[in-house]
């Protein structure tokens, strides 16, 4: 990255990401059918989600082939199991853009695994090996904690899983009657920048798109979460999401507004992202991307790919806005 543009002039290509200048302000969303909405019977805990971010960071940077990566992956899988979900790991060997051989691990946790009607929520759990967007060039080879970029999406999913367990155990709450999968992508954030660099990012989701964890897996749609835990964050209707899954985008953004989080979920079309949702969409599954943009700067969050992407810069209200919106979606 050589610099950032404001949101009115960016075309973001993220596989954790490249920003390219483009013209035009975010477009107002098209008028769409109103979504029926009933408030969810449960409350998403931003404190729990924050603690899950902190726990991931406590292992150290979750870079490929590292001990921290292995230990954190084991903890994520064990935590989903503790919340009563069926968990499996999808392993695969791959090479990074520089030829480094890596062992990937996509983690899939399933609520109501026997249900045929399913949706999924996803996010990547690895962290970037280099702080190559840090103002201090001497830190460009330093691995980052990935508290927001990676950790926040996984934390939201873990808290959603905990809430689903509460619903399943409570006689007075009608738990969702649909199967829900939480997919934790690996090897998203070790790509390189350049004109033909897109395929170097999102290796875990690229692999899964060709080798789904079950042969007959055909969810109604997916929702990918990326960088959903920093301050001054907003979410636009992302271009690829609108191309492949406009009804899902509409549903989520309307529910967010009805639940009181309209100031986070901006009712306008933003930039194009090449994130984990893209290989999923291209494989035939509608999937949307909820990815954070700094409200003031119109760029990725200011801690993006810097050593400051740590637990000190996680903002609980943003975790709450995204987490409660996802909970409302699951119960509606």
Language model segments and positions:
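Solvent-exposed loop/turn segments at secondary-structure junctions
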Residues: 62-64, 94-95, 114-115, 125-129, ...
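Active-site-adjacent substrate-binding region
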Residues: 91-93, 101, 221, 228-332
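Bacterial N-terminal signal peptides that target proteins for export
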Residues: 2-11
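C-terminal motif of bacterial Sec signal peptides marking the signal peptidase cleavage site
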Residues: 18-21
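N-terminal capping segment at the start of a domain
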Residues: 26-72, 83, 298-313
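A non-catalytic alpha/beta surface segment that caps or lines the substrate-entry region
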Residues: 51-114
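Acidic/histidine-rich catalytic neighborhood of metal-dependent amide-processing enzymes
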Residues: 141-247, 272
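Second-shell loop/turn segments in exported
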Residues: 35-43, 58-67, 94-97, 139-151, ...
């Amino acid at each position: 990255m050589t610099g950032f543009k404001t949101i009115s002039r960016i075309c973001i290509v993220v596989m954790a990401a490249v920003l390219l200048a483009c013209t035009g302000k975010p477009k107002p969303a098209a008028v769409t059918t109103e979504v029926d909405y009933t408030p969810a019977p449960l409350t998403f805990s931003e404190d729990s989600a924050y603690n899950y971010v902190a726990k991931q960071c406590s292992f150290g940077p979750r870079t490929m082939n590292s001990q921290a990566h292995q230990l954190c992956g084991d903890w994520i899988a064990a935590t989903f199991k503790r919340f009563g979900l069926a968990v499996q790991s999808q392993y695969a060997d791959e090479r990074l853009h520089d030829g480094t051989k890596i062992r990937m691990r996509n983690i899939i946790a399933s609520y109501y695994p026997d249900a045929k009607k399913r949706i999924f929520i996803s996010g990547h759990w690895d962290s970037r090996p280099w702080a190559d967007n840090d103002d201090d060039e001497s830190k460009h080879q330093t691995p980052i904690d990935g508290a927001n970029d990676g950790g926040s999406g996984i934390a939201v999913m873990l808290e959603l899983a905990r809430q689903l367990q509460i619903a399943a155990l409570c006689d007075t709450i009608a738990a969702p009657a649909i199967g829900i999968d939480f997919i934790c992508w690996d090897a998203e954030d070790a790509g390189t920048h350049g004109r033909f660099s897109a395929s170097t990012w999102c290796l875990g989701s690229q692999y899964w798109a060709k080798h789904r964890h079950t042969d007959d897996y055909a969810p109604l749609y997916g929702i990918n979460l990326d960088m959903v835990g920093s301050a001054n964050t907003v979410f636009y209707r992302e271009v690829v999401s609108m191309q492949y899954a406009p009804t899902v985008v509409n549903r989520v953004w309307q529910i967010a507004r009805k639940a009181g989080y309209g100031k986070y979920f901006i009712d306008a079309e933003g930039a194009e992202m090449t994130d984990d949702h893209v290989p999923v969409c291209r494989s035939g599954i509608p999937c949307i991307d909820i990815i954070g943009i700094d409200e003031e700067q119109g760029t990725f969050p200011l801690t993006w790919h810097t050593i400051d992407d740590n637990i000190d810069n996680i903002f609980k209200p943003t975790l709450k806005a995204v987490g409660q919106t996802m909970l409302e979606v699951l119960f509606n």
